[in-house]
């Protein structure tokens, strides 16, 4: 994933910065507890494609 892209992407719901989880290939919005998938190096920033995360899952991102 190109880090210059990460600098401009924000959560489509709340506009918060996203955390890049390289291992799981997702972009995480801690505020909305959503994980947006990255497929073939392309972030899928559609709310309907995002996975809802538990509070415990979100906590591991700090």
From Swiss-Prot:
HAMAP family: UPF0434 (MF_01187)
Family from the record: Belongs to the UPF0434 family.
Cellular component, GO, one term: cytosol
Protein name as catalogued: UPF0434 protein FTL_1400
Domain of life, source organism: Bacteria
InterPro entries according to UniProt: Trm112-like
